[in-house]
Amino acid sequence: TIKIGYVSDLTGATALWGTAGQYGAELAIKQVNENGGVLDGKMLELVPMDGKGEPADSVSAFKNLVEVHNIVAEIGTNFSSCNIPMASVADEVKVPIIGTAASNELVTVDENGNLHPYSFRMCFIDSYLGTVIGNYAYDTLGSRNAALFTVAGNTNSESVGQFLRDAFTAKGGTIVADEQCQDGDVDFRAQLANIGAKNPDIVFVIMNDYAKNATFAKQAREMGIDCMLMGHDGWDSAQLAGEAEGALENCLYVSRIGFSTPEAKAFGEEVAKTYNITMEGECLFGHDGVMWLVDAINRAGSADPQAIRDALEQTDVFEGLIGTLVMDPATHNPSMACAVYECHGDSFDFKEIIEAQ
């Protein structure tokens, strides 16, 4: 049996995501094993371990998987803060790890830009997403005067915001208001007053909490700010549109392709049915993590961790449920197509694909 580790937030506030990823990976492994496994009949086994969404716990979980369970590779976590310290450990123990939604630059390279040879990811990075959003707002939506709203001290929010700002202004757009909140804030009216005074044609709302995004939208509308609100993958929740109670009607966010293809939707529905959970995008990452490792093991002709690492790095094109992944061997960052979602009533519906840039 070939063991694959899975570290994620299986308990705590965000366990919804971690468990969805685990179930996606388990179902993918079940399907692979039913079809004869890998390397002429070897079976796969998933060994999940709770990292609680905390860096220290995630590192301990990964070490345990390597030392006690002899895993050949690891999938997870979905947090950059956890994968950054895990990357150094992966290099030491020479076991490849694949972050799912860990989008900070430092997941695969250190502060000096040196590659972590054993750390990979399956999502686009903050700079890529920020650039895509800035370009789309300028080119496709015709926005020229934008407000930007980010969370102070939140790496993802500030990083996406920075690259979005750079892309939008490089095209000739103007950021007329640049406002921030603290992590725990739920009242955004002071910042919204400043934004409203500048009369932007769009507000970029880069927060990673659907309840806060909904609150922001409702407060903006109450204060007479009725322009387009636009977000990033931090808006990715089935709850957001309903929570916003109409305040996000016709608003957009850009994220991964998610459930917008029939294959992804069918798999999501199968996970939801099999494990009795709601359909969360993280289950697609679990699936694709397993299938990318299967692809790498088969190409390598070996389940040796070093051979798997080499094959992951040399991935020309991997067709997953979250879209087509093209690996950059120099950075271990994939370039991927993104999807635009538009709010109608209680849901965000797939609008269009933005091809990989």
What do the PLM-derived regions correspond to, one by one?
Residues 1-3, 34, 355-357:
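Short, low-complexity disordered leader/linker segments with a strong preference
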Residues 2-26, 49-56, 78-79, 149-158, ...:
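Extracytoplasmic "Venus flytrap"
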Residues 16-23, 31, 35-109, 122, ...:
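Beta-alpha junction/loop-to-helix N-cap segments that form part of ligand/metal-binding clefts
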Residues 19-26, 131, 157-165, 261, ...:
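Short, surface-exposed alpha-helical segments at coil->helix boundaries
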Residues 71-179, 226-252:
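Extracytoplasmic ligand/sensor domains, especially the bilobed periplasmic-binding protein
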Residues 217-287, 298, 342-356:
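Extracellular/periplasmic periplasmic-binding protein-like sensory domains
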Residues 271-284, 294-349:
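Segments of small-molecule ligand-sensing domains
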